[in-house]
């Protein structure tokens, strides 16, 4: 098996698309964000899917950046670092949510509820320590990084520009959740999921084009040589 840059980039595209699909899927019929839900098997399964989503998204956006590192410039680098940091921290918090919080439900239900409140953008009653900072930085990286990275992708003119716009609008639009009812929390994730799917497919298709063009070019050259020899 030969590992090539094209193959890795196409894999990154598929990873981004898969991350987008999971991001949308986990929002459907999401259980309430409280200690009672954390104690269920569904919570572990759903948040395990979010852990996978975070890992796939990191692979995907890395592939997007490397594909257009020259065209994206400094703005692209800043956006990638912020957005990547946001997803890395999101991956970490989902690991905690899936595998640590369930073990704390019986011991410290109030602490678990406070973390969930903070994760949803609310103000916890008690002290949750460093988790408050982690969640805040995660939100900043996700929103600001997504905005800048989407703008850089749009300006680079390589991947689907509509998806780049949707990524910017969807991520920074998350800030509006502080003013909107809780019922908007899940639907607001859908635009970002669609953007990741669009960008991922665009990256995958972009890597198919050069390979598909080579046989055609070779065929034209062969036909020209045969015609000249007649």
Feature-to-residue mapping (PLM):
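Hydrophobic, aromatic-enriched alpha-helical segments typical of multi-pass transmembrane helices
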Residues: 1-230
């Amino acid at each position: 098996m030969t590992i090539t840059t094209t193959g890795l980039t196409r894999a990154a595209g598929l990873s981004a698309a898969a991350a987008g699909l999971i991001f949308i899927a986990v929002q459907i019929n999401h259980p309430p964000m409280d200690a009672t839900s954390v104690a269920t098997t569904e919570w572990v399964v759903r948040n395990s899917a979010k852990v996978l989503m975070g890992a796939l998204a990191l692979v995907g956006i890395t592939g997007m950046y490397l594909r257009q590192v020259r065209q994206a410039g400094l703005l692209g680098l800043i956006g990638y670092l912020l957005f990547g940091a946001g997803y890395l921290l999101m991956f970490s918090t989902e690991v905690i949510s899936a595998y640590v919080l369930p073990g704390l439900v019986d011991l410290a239900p109030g602490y678990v509820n406070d973390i969930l409140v903070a994760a949803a953008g609310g103000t916890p009653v008690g002290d949750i320590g460093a988790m408050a900072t982690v969640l805040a930085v995660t939100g900043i990286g996700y929103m600001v990084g997504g905005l800048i990275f989407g703008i850089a992708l749009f300006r680079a003119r390589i991947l689907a520009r509509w998806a780049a716009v949707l990524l910017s609008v969807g991520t920074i639009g998350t800030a509006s959740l502080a003013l909107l009812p809780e019922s908007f929390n899940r639907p607001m994730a859908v635009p970002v999921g669609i953007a990741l799917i669009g960008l991922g497919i665009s990256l995958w298709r972009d890597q198919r084009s050069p390979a598909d063009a080579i046989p055609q070019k070779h065929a034209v050259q062969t036909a020209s040589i045969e015609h000249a020899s007649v």
